[in-house]
């Protein structure tokens, strides 16, 4: 199979960007040399981020990596709805004119916020230009002095950024999705903080509905039960990041919280627009008190220009598609395709042997068995030293996936992440499965041969390309 030039050129560009730079900068000023030395730490593990072009938008590769989960961008549905929305307001302003509290507020944004709040079962909504800034706003405005934050160890970087600048001095992580570890963390905080014991301060619990690197789902119901037990004075509040649940989970994509009927139990929700909704921004859902706290204490509200009319209009357009049921078929197809992948990959004749040899593992299959839904995120594990080789194998097979490495995940936890979309097909899934097992079979043959130093063909091609670009 011929590999498109774009894939080869992108791989070559990526490899070039991983070359160490600092050793050639001895005559540079300390400012630039120190920056390059820091970047070389990333380059040394092939984890240097670059501005590489994607290979799926033009059809060079099959998209199993993008965030266009409902395929609203690819199909043009969102564009059509957006242009229709703009046509209703021919005199719209391009510029909001200031922050939400300094002249930049306007009727349309308030109307859209309330529509979203009503749709998702919240009292209020407050819009942000990104999910990252929404999370930072939450943690820099909501925790009060004396409060404590108990958080899942795998929460987003934006949550950590916000927590680091929060007024909560006590922050305790618990082992990912482990309700026993969560109980221990809650008890530890309760026993060590007198003001929380007497009910005058609160424990804020930070979790995500769906975890972006593992694809698993937060046990929200069980965690709420534990929190009620540990905090009889009800001085706890859950903050739930719904970035990967919005548009995917629940009827009409309302997210995990509303799907479980927990709208009244969760104090703060972050619902982003940059994943399934195929646009940008986020909304923070909560009570009027929560909204007022952010309007007064969050710098990313008070010191940032309010979202413009077009950016609000495209978010409204996306939620219109959800609310009217226009995306339900896409949602259902994601559920079908993920289950189809699970069945196809786990029924392969090499599945058990590959698992036993550590060549292939997909823990999310087992984790999903007891739920009435699956998520679109499917991490694929192989041996750590083979992770890049599997990535090369799939890239050269014209399959676009994402290699997840340190520092995105802890050292020794590298994996490939597959994202399944509404417009993927069964035949594309079949091809993906066949290519995964093509790699597995090749590695089995290499190991059986006992030939030292032998590497798979895709890796040979990539390393030859690296040498040619040295």
Swiss-Prot record:
Keywords: Aminotransferase, Pyridoxal phosphate, Transferase. It comes from the Eukaryota. It is an enzyme of class 2 (transferase). The modification N6-(pyridoxal phosphate)lysine is found at residue 275. Its EC number is 2.3.1.-. GO terms for molecular function: pyridoxal phosphate binding; transaminase activity. InterPro entries: Aminotransferase_I/II_large, AON_synthase_class-II, PyrdxlP-dep_Trfase, PyrdxlP-dep_Trfase_major, PyrdxlP-dep_Trfase_small. Pyridoxal 5'-phosphate binds at residues 212, 244, 272. SUPFAM superfamilies: PLP-dependent transferases (SSF53383). GO terms for biological process: biotin biosynthetic process. The sphingofungin E shows a limited antifungal spectrum of activity but are especially effective against Cryptococcus species, fungal pathogens causing opportunistic infections in human. It holds the Pfam family Aminotran_1_2. Pathway: Secondary metabolite biosynthesis. Its cofactor is pyridoxal 5'-phosphate. Aminoacyl transferase; part of the gene cluster that mediates the biosynthesis of sphingofungins, bioactive molecules acting as sphingolipid inhibitors via inhibiting serine palmitoyl transferase (SPT). Within the pathway, sphA transfers 2-methyl-aminomalonate and 2-hydroxymethyl-aminomalonate onto the sphB product 3-hydroxyoctadeca-4,10-dienoyl-ACP to produce the precursors of sphingofungins E and F. Belongs to the class-II pyridoxal-phosphate-dependent aminotransferase family. BioF subfamily. Homodimer. This is Aminoacyl transferase sphA. The gene is sphA.
């Amino acid at each position: 199979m011929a590999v498109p030039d774009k894939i080869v050129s992108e791989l070559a560009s990526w490899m070039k960007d991983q070359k160490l730079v600092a050793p050639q900068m001895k005559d540079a000023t300390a400012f630039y040399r120190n920056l390059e030395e820091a970047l070389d730490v990333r380059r040394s593990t092939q984890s240097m981020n670059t501005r590489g072009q994607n290979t799926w938008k033009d059809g060079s590769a099959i998209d199993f990596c993008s965030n266009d989960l409902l395929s609203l961008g690819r199909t043009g549905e969102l564009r059509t709805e957006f242009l229709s929305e703009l046509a209703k307001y021919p005199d719209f302003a391009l510029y909001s004119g200031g922050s939400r509290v300094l002249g930049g507020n306007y009727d349309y944004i308030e109307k859209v916020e309330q529509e979203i709040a009503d749709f998702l079962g919240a009292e209020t909504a407050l819009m942000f230009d990104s999910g990252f800034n929404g999370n930072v706003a939450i943690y820099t405005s909501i925790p009060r002095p004396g409060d404590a934050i108990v958080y899942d160890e795998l929460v987003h970087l934006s949550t950590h950024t916000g927590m680091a600048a929060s007024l909560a001095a006590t922050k305790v992580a618990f082992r990912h999705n482990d309700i026993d570890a969560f109980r221990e963390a809650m008890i530890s905080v309760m026993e060590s903080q007198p003001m929380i014991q007497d009910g005058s301060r609160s424990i804020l619990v930070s979790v995500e509905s769906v975890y972006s690197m593992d694809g698993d789902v937060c046990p929200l119901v069980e965690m709420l039960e534990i929190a009620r037990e540990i905090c009889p004075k009800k001085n706890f509040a859950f903050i739930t990041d719904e970035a990967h649940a919005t548009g995917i989970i629940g009827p009409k994509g309302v997210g995990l919280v509303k799907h479980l009927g927990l709208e009244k139990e969760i104090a703060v929700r972050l619902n982003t627009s940059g994943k399934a909704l195929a646009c940008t921004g986020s909304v923070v859902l909560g009570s009027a008190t929560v909204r007022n706290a952010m309007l007064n204490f969050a710098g990313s509200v008070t010191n940032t220009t309010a979202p413009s009319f077009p950016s609000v209009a495209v978010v409204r357009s996306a939620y219109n598609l959800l609310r009217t049921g226009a995306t339900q078929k896409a949602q259902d197809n994601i559920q079908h395709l993920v289950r189809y992948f699970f069945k196809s990959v786990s029924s392969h004749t090499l599945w058990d042997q590959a698992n036993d040899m550590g060549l292939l593992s997909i823990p999310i299959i087992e984790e999903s068995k007891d739920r009435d839904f699956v998520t679109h995120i499917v991490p694929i594990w192989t041996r750590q030293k083979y992770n890049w080789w599997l990535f090369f194998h799939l890239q050269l097979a014209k399959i676009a996936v994402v290699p997840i490495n340190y520092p995105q995940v802890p050292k020794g936890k590298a994996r490939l992440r597959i994202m399944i979309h509404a417009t993927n097909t069964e035949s594309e899934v079949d091809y993906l499965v066949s290519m995964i097992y093509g790699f597995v079979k090749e590695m089995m043959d290499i190991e059986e041969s006992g030939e030292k130093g032998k590497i798979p063909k895709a890796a040979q091609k990539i390393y030859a390309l690296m040498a040619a670009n040295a």
